[in-house]
Amino acid sequence: MTSKRIRFAAVGAGRVFQRYHLPCADARDAMDLVGLVDSDIERARELMADRPQVWTGTSVDRLIQETRPDLISVCTPNDAHAEPVLAALDAGIAVLCEKPLAATVEEARRMVAHPAAEKLLGVNMPFRFHPLLKPFADLVRSGAQRVEFSFATPGNRVWRACTPWYDDARRAGGGALLDLGPHAIDLLMAVFGPPVVEACEVDTPDLEQRVRVDMSFQGVPATLRIDRAARRLETSVTVTTADGDHVLDLRRNELRRANGTVEEAGQGPELAAISAYFDTVTGAATPHGKVSAQEALEVQLVVESAYGCARGVAAPLA
């Protein structure tokens, strides 16, 4: 474990930073928040009102010059990920980017291609760090006959983003599939490997709220359903085996086996990827505590392939 104090900064002072990244940083004695950038400078200043030592501004370059951070979180809208990530990598700074990696596959590829990306860039996709995922994977990986992933949320009616960019197709890059799909697809790929996308249906082009994706994992059929305008909360994956249905309920933090036994986890996965990456940088964990940019790109290529199916356009995973 390193004794060095980690100078932490962030780009984007909205809901994701406030609810996830900032509490994770504050929970670590080795991390000091030194800077915060936001396009709305008053928002950043108001948020840091009780932390006068924290530099605030609107320029990522100035942030790097003025605060000399060791670690930067990028919590901006999807179309504004690439610039701060690449600036951090150019400066040799560890950077944790929110999912998806970018609003477009082209921008995501540009980030992955940076020489420092493999070492320094991580992506916040937390479901693979859920404490029940390993026992679930051990239970279902070899005998899966059918996979169903259901993701339902009231979306922005509950989330209430500080900046209303989710309804801007250019900024978001997509709808519910690009917003929530990476969480589900990353978990499924962690268990079953890369999928083949066979069909995709969306309720509306560009900014879909509801989507169904049919895939297969080495011949095992799988369906992903996402509803970002639901009146309920559900995040669960059900795998059918010869023994029956095994359910990993990420909302209730339960693994419900086909034999009726239930295993519970003490905490949910929401902060897991951020915590793992922060612990990697501070030296509290091994260097394996992150989702790499390459892995995030592979997930985004699955999303792009699904969008291609919905449009009737071939989008191979390459």
Q: Where are the predicted features?
A:
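Predominantly a Rossmann-like dinucleotide-binding segment in NAD(P)-dependent oxidoreductases
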Residues: 127-196, 313
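Hydrophobic residues in well-ordered beta-strands that form the structural core
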Residues: 96-97, 121-123, 248
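N-terminal Rossmann-like dinucleotide-binding module
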Residues: 1-51
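Beta-loop-alpha module in the N-terminal Rossmann-like domain of NAD(P)-dependent dehydrogenases
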Residues: 40, 55-112
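Contiguous beta-strand/loop segments that form the cofactor/metal-binding neighborhood of enzyme cores
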Residues: 185-254, 275-285
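Short, conserved SAM-binding/catalytic segment
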Residues: 46-53, 111-116
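Rossmann-fold dehydrogenase core element
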Residues: 108-126, 144-149
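C-terminal helix-rich "cap/oligomerization" subdomain common to oxidoreductases
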Residues: 1-2, 62, 71-73, 218, ...
